[in-house]
Curated annotation (Swiss-Prot):
GO terms for biological process: positive regulation of response to salt stress; regulation of developmental process; regulation of plant-type cell wall organization or biogenesis; response to ethylene. This is Protein BASIC PENTACYSTEINE2. It comes from Arabidopsis thaliana (Mouse-ear cress). Belongs to the BBR/BPC family. GO terms for molecular function: cis-regulatory region sequence-specific DNA binding; DNA binding; DNA-binding transcription factor activity; sequence-specific double-stranded DNA binding. It is found in: Nucleus. Transcriptional regulator that specifically binds to GA-rich elements (GAGA-repeats) present in regulatory sequences of genes involved in developmental processes. GO terms for cellular component: nucleus. Residues 126-167 are annotated as: Disordered.
């Protein structure tokens, strides 16, 4: 029993043992004396279950139980008073009705209360929906690759095995003194201004450029430019038209074109000195 004289719900005693000393009394006084609220005076958050263990429950909202006592009074006034041993099986639903009543009230409160969602929770839910929508979006199907033809693979293998042949040089025909002459087969001209023959560079379309002399300098290699990084001072130049005139002069003198032509004395006196990158 509790300090208030209320029996624990976890234990059950027969009706005869409970009302043993009250057989000669009226039933009305015992019920009024033992009538207590359905929730005991202790902490309502701790409730004892049928196995004797305490279960944590949410605290119920305060409600008035006067209407329940009024119905009980009407019910017990209708019962006959007997001196014989009464049947208390119908009068002891209190131990079982209190938990069921509390469960019904708890369920009723859950259905009636509609919790209001905060704005932050609503924003979080909308963000989750957006992320789920992005994640659930089906990716674009990749286009299937076309199967490679075996014939093309065989052709590629055959091409790799065959040595590449350099394309033939284009013939550059010039009419020298009425005679057509292919200058693409001529040896590369040289310049001997430094005392040693130095091959000239090709310049433009059919022209040549000196690698060792300018209008003021005669040295090999030419010095680097102080104004542009990675560039050398360019040598004197000769266009295709000027080179044709040189060939006409040498052909009239009977020069053997099997030997390289020395352009030392054939450079233009007004040669330009541009900056070019020589690799």
């Amino acid at each position: 029993m509790d300090d208030d004289g209320f029996r624990n719900w976890g234990y059950y005693e027969p009706a005869a043992a409970t009302f043993k000393g009250n057989l000669g009394l009226q039933l009305m006084s015992t019920i009024d004396r033992n009538t207590k609220p359905f929730l005991p005076g202790r902490d309502p958050n701790l409730m004892m279950g049928p196995n004797g263990s305490y279960h944590h429950q949410e605290p119920p909202i305060h409600m008035s139980y006067n209407w329940i006592n009024q119905q009980k009074d009407k019910f017990f006034n209708m019962l006959p008073v007997t001196t014989a041993t009464p049947n208390y099986g119908n009068v002891l639903p209190e131990t079982s009705s209190a938990p069921s009543m509390q469960m019904n009230l708890h369920h009723h409160l859950q259905t009636e209360e509609n919790p209001v969602k905060l704005e932050e929770e609503i924003v979080v839910q909308t963000k989750k929906r957006k992320t789920n929508a992005k994640a659930g979006s089906t990716p674009k199907a990749k286009k299937p690759r076309k199967p490679k033809d075996e014939n093309s693979n065989n052709n590629n293998n055959n091409n790799t095995n065959v040595t590449r042949v350099k394309p033939a040089k284009k013939s550059v025909d010039l009419v020298i003194n009425g005679v057509s002459m292919d200058i693409s087969g001529l040896p590369v001209p040289i310049c001997t201004c430094t005392g040693a023959p130095q091959q000239c560079y090709r310049w433009g379309c059919g022209g040549w450029q000196s690698a060792c002399c300018t209008t003021n300098i005669s040295m090999h290699p030419l010095p680097m430019s102080t104004k542009r990084r990675g560039a050398r001072i360019s040598g004197r130049k000769m266009s295709q038209g000027a080179f044709k005139k040189v060939l006409e002069k040498l052909a009239s003198d009977g020069f053997n074109f099997g030997n390289p032509i020395d352009l030392k004395s054939h450079w233009a006196r007004h040669g330009t000195n541009k900056f070019v990158t020589i690799r």
